[in-house]
Amino acid sequence: AISVSMQTMLDLLEAQAIEKDTAVLDKFYDSVRKRASDIDNAEGRQRIIIELYDKFFKTAFPKMVERLGIVYTPIEIVDFIIHSVNDVLKKEFDRTISDENIHILDPFTGTGTFITRLLQSGLIEKKDLERKYLHELHANEIVLLAYYIAAVNIENAYHDLLGDGKEYQSFDGICLTDTFQLGETPESEQLFSEMFPQNSERVAAQKKAPIRVIIGNPPYSAKQKSTNDNAQNQSYTKLDKRISELYGKDVKTSNINTLYNPYIKAFRWSTDRLENENGGIICFVSDGGWVENNSHVGFRKCIEREFSAIYVFNLRGNQRTSGELSRKEGGKIFGSGSRTPIAITLLVKNPKIKSEKATIQYHDIGDYLSREEKLSIVRKFHSVSNEVLKWKNIFPNEHGDWLGERSDVFETFIPLEPTSKFDSLSPSFFIINSLGVFTNRDPWSYNFSKKELSVNISRM
C-alpha cells in the first residue's frame, strides 16, 4: 500500500514532467538514496526527511514556501512539544496522550513529523496503539506532495511498531484540506472531493471529533513583498472577523496587519476548535514576536482571559536586527527558513479552574547561543515540566505588557497639543496647531540660488 501511494504521487509528477525537470528530480532522488542508506534509527529517518524536503520545497516551489510560510521543524522541538503536552495533560487533567478519547490534531502537518514522532515516542502504550492510530490521531495538509509524504511517513512509523506479519492499515486520519477553511462555509469539507472522494468523509469525521490536543508548527508568512510575487495570503471571512473582534480591540497602533499573520490565525482557529466544556491543550512552535510587539497587545490580553495556564519558552533568534543586538539574539532555530524570533507556546484551557486570568510562566533560552546550542538545550530540557527549566512568573500590567513593562510616568507629562483639535479645556501647552510653512511646491519655492529662486517664483 505504501508503494501504491508513492506510485500515485510519482504518476502525478510524471504526467506534468518535462525532460529537464525529470533530470533534476533524478539527481534529487539519488541524493535521497545516498543519504538514507546509512540511517538505522527512527530519529535519523525523520531528520533526513525534514532536511531533504525542506530543501526540495525551497528549490522547487519558492513562491509556495513564501506564501504558505513553509518551514520544517527540528526534531528536538517536535519531541519537546510532544512530551510537554503529555506532562501537562497529566498535571491538569489527570490524563495521558495514550488514554481513550484524547484526540490529537496537527492542523499543519507538513511531512507528518509531529504525528510520526508521537507514534515513535513510546508515550502511547502498546494496548492503545491501534485505537489511537485508527481513531484518535488527526492531521491536515494542503500541499499535495507533503500530504503524500506525511501519509507514507505516519503509516511506516505505525507498521514499524507493529512488526512483521500484521495486516496493513492505511492512515485515515490525514486530510488534504486547508485547515483555516474548515468552518468558513458548509461546503468546506468538499475540498478536493473530486480528486479524492474519501477526503470529504475524513474531513467530516474530523470535524465531529472531540479534539483535546492541538500541536504543530503553523505557517508564518504575513504578506508578500510585492504584488508581482503572486504570493498573497488567502483571506478567511469568519476567522478574520474573530481576530478583529477579539485581538484587535485593545490595539492602539494604527497598523494591525500582523494580527492576520497565519500563525496568529492558527492560535485563533485552534482556540475556537477546543471544546469549552472539556478544555484541552494547544502547543505551537511559532513566530515569537507576539510576546513583546505593541500590535499584539490584544492577542496577549485575550489568551490571558481564555486560558487557565500559559507557558512560553522563548528561543529568540530575531535576525531582523543588526550589530550587537543581532549577535545577542543568537542562531535562527529554522536556519535560513525564518528570520523572526521563535517561541514554543503551550496554552491550557482547564474548565475546572475558575480564574479570570491565566497563570503565565516564561523562560528565555539566553543570549549569544548558536542554533546548535539552542537545540541542545531544548533536547536536554525535554519538557516544560523539567525542574531544571527555571520558569519566571509573568504578571502583565493593565496595558497588556508582558516583558519590558512601560512606565506610567509618561502619561503624567503635559502634552504639546490637545488630543482633539481646538480643545480649549485641554491641559496642553498649545491649543492651536498647523502645518507651518507648507508650500505644496517646495521644488519651486526653495533654492540655494537667489537668482534661480527669483526666476522660479516669477514663472509661477
Predicted regions and their residues:
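Charged/polar, low-hydrophobicity segments characteristic of intrinsically disordered regions
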Residues: Q7-S31, A151, R371-W391
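Alpha-helix initiation and N-capping motif
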Residues: S3-M6, T22-L25, R45-I50, I115, ...
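Sequence-level detector for compositionally biased, low-complexity segments
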Residues: D172, T227-N228, T253, W269-M460
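Intrinsic-disorder/low-complexity, polar/charged segments
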Residues: S37, N41-G44, F93-R95, V143, ...
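Short alpha-helical "patches" and their helix-cap loops
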Residues: I2-D11, Y72, I97-I102, F284, ...
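Eukaryote-specific, cytoplasm-facing alpha-helical/coiled-coil scaffolding segments in long proteins
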Residues: L12, I77-V78, I82, N140, ...
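Long recognition/docking surfaces used for binding and targeting
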Residues: A1-F61
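SAM-dependent methyltransferase catalytic region
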Residues: G44-R45, I49, F56-V312, S322
